[in-house]
């Protein structure tokens, strides 16, 4: 369920201060944050955030298409290694036990 329009988008106060400071100085410095829950505002377009995914910081360059989404959407927390394959088929096709 989307957030009420009357409330406005949520963004952590400390992150908003960093965004405003970066805009005032036109600095291209990466803004490090743990705040995955903060909404991306139009003021943050063109900035790069280092969003924590639980293990490391993932660099996220903000574009216009990202406005309205949360920072955490662009820093995946889980790594998908793929489903296990059929081990019998691998051996029969030409593994060490084949021909």
From Swiss-Prot:
Region feature (Disordered): 77-99
GO BP terms: ribosomal small subunit assembly; translation
SUPFAM superfamilies: Ribosomal protein S19
SS bonds (residue pairs): none
Gene Ontology cellular component terms for the protein in this record: cytoplasm; small ribosomal subunit
A GO MF term: structural constituent of ribosome
Residues passing through the membrane, by range: none
HAMAP family: Ribosomal_uS19
Function recorded in the entry: Protein S19 forms a complex with S13 that binds strongly to the 16S ribosomal RNA.
Family, per entry: Belongs to the universal ribosomal protein uS19 family.
Protein name: Small ribosomal subunit protein uS19
The organism of origin for this protein: Sorangium cellulosum (strain So ce56)
């Amino acid at each position: 369920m989307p957030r009420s329009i009357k409330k406005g988008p949520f963004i952590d106060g400390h992150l908003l201060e960093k965004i405003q400071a970066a805009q005032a100085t036109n600095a291209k410095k990466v803004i490090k944050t743990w705040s995955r829950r903060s909404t991306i505002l139009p003021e943050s377009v063109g900035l790069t955030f280092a969003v924590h995914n639980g293990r490391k910081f993932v660099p996220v360059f903000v574009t216009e298409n990202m406005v309205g989404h949360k920072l955490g959407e662009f820093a995946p927390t889980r790594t998908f290694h793929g489903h296990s394959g059929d081990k019998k088929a691998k051996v029969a096709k030409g593994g060490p036990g084949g021909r």
